[in-house]
């Protein structure tokens, strides 16, 4: 049996490193690939391979990210590491690399620093469910009490942003030593301990297919003698012929029944997460449905106009605005498949204006309701040009 085949059978989890600049996130990423490839097979990546992160685009925004993979005894991990602080902010807000759990890297020599705090805040805002801590550069700290002090500081910081700081696992080690093949406690064993902790502390995420059905509507057709067909890509769950579904967003919510599912012009019994399908709706007129609405399992999602969000505003160099904007700013918010105009009702206290390149918490009111839940991503656009990205952090009404 080939090794590659074996990898696929383990459950898959997405993780990433977060933390202050130069605290060792990329070194730890390299150490994870080295130590685990030696133990479980797979490819090891050198520091500079990871550090030269390729650029990718998500929601019209360019982000530099490195993707590596490794496996533990129980799982297959896909791990994302970003070279610069701005890339982390953009990555977390756009959800370009969704994280089921984050590894917070803190230098034992420096303790928590401004970006440590900022990354914890962002992780909370964008819904990263769990954090484990790797207290790095422990080989540079001889004083056991100092280590304990840093550990307490990190726990307090996590607690202050509603993560369970007291229960959070903290692994003490040196990513550099592990990379050099050091077998002492802070070396390779700390990496094995970290991944074993991730295996137990990060719960297995619910698969998209097991969640309630949702499909954003991309197009609507009328087929004579058969009725109305809507097309799109199933985002989550399963749709079966005969299922009752709701049409949510833009207008009042209505109920209908799925009377047919087709893919590649073939009729199917069901469509599932990831499929591009056409869904035939019973008794629904073509003008009653439009792009921007969603089909969903009844009661699973509701339409809203007013919400809080964390947004990243593109800098001028990234093709964004050249000037700041104020409260009352009215761009379009692109949710899933359509633009909806909205207004910035409020900015954080003491912030008069938002500069290109900033990330900020805002309250938005849309002119039409959109099917949303917390964690939904969107783009901020002006006349079709992307000027920012955001994530819904709290629904107001």
From Swiss-Prot:
Its EC number is 3.6.5.3. GO terms for cellular component: cytoplasm. Gene3D superfamilies: P-loop containing nucleotide triphosphate hydrolases (3.40.50.300), Translation factors (2.40.30.10). The lineage of its organism: Bacteria, Pseudomonadati, Pseudomonadota, Gammaproteobacteria, Legionellales. Residues 60-64 are annotated as: G2. Its main location: cytoplasm. It catalyses: GTP + H2O = GDP + phosphate + H(+). GTP hydrolase that promotes the GTP-dependent binding of aminoacyl-tRNA to the A-site of ribosomes during protein biosynthesis. It is found in: Cytoplasm. GO terms for molecular function: GTP binding; GTPase activity; guanosine tetraphosphate binding; translation elongation factor activity. GO terms for biological process: translational elongation. Monomer. GTP binds at residues 19-26, 81-85, 136-139. Mg(2+) binds at residue 26. Residues 10-206 form the tr-type G domain. Residues 19-26 are annotated as: G1. This is Elongation factor Tu. Keywords: Cytoplasm, Elongation factor, GTP-binding, Hydrolase, Magnesium, Metal-binding, Nucleotide-binding, Protein biosynthesis. Residues 81-84 are annotated as: G3. InterPro entries: EF-Tu_GTP-bd (IPR041709), EF-Tu_GTPase (IPR050055), EFTu-like_2 (IPR004161), EFTU_2 (IPR033720), G_TR_CS (IPR031157), P-loop_NTPase (IPR027417), Small_GTP-bd (IPR005225), T_Tr_GTP-bd_dom (IPR000795). Belongs to the TRAFAC class translation factor GTPase superfamily. Classic translation factor GTPase family. EF-Tu/EF-1A subfamily. Residues 136-139 are annotated as: G4. It is an enzyme of class 3 (hydrolase). Residues 174-176 are annotated as: G5.
């Amino acid at each position: 049996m080939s090794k590659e085949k074996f990898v696929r059978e383990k459950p898959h989890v997405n993780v990433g490193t977060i933390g202050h600049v130069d605290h060792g996130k990329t070194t730890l990423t390299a150490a994870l690939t080295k130590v685990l490839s030696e133990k479980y097979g797979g490819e090891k990546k050198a520091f500079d391979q990871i550090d030269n992160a390729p650029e990718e685009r998500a929601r019209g925004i360019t982000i530099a990210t490195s993707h590596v993979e490794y496996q533990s005894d129980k799982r297959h991990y896909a791990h994302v590491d970003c070279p610069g602080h701005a890339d982390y902010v953009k990555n977390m807000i756009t959800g370009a690399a969704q994280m089921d759990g984050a590894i917070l890297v803190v230098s034992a020599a420096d303790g928590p620093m401004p970006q440590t705090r900022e990354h914890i805040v962002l992780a909370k805002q964008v819904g990263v469910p769990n954090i484990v801590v790797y207290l790095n550069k422990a080989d540079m700290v001889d004083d056991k009490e100092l280590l304990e002090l840093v550990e307490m500081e990190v726990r307090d910081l996590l607690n202050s942003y509603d993560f369970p700081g007291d229960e959070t696992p903290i692994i003490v080690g040196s990513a550099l030593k592990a990379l050099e093949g050091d077998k002492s406690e802070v070396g390779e064993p700390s990496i094995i301990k970290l991944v074993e902790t991730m295996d137990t502390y990060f719960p297995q995420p619910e698969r998209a297919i097991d969640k309630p059905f949702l499909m954003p509507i991309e197009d609507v057709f009328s087929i004579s003698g058969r009725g109305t067909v809507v097309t799109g890509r199933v985002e989550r769950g399963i749709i079966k012929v005969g299922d009752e579904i709701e049409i949510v967003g833009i207008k009042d919510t209505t109920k209908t029944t799925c009377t047919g599912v087709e893919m590649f012009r073939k009729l199917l019994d069901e469509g599932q997460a990831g499929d591009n399908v056409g869904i035939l709706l019973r008794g629904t007129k073509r003008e009653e449905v439009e792009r921007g609405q969603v089909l969903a399992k009844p009661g699973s999602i509701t339409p809203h106009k007013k919400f809080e969000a964390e947004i990243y505003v593109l800098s001028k160099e990234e093709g964004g605005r050249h000037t700041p904007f104020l409260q009352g700013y009215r761009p379009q918010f692109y949710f899933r498949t359509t633009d909806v105009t909205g207004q910035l009702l409020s900015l954080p206290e003491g912030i008069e204006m938002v500069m290109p390149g900033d990330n900020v918490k805002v309250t938005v009111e849309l002119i039409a309701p959109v099917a949303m839940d917390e964690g939904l991503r969107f783009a901020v656009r002006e006349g079709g040009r992307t000027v920012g990205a955001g994530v819904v952090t709290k629904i107001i009404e």
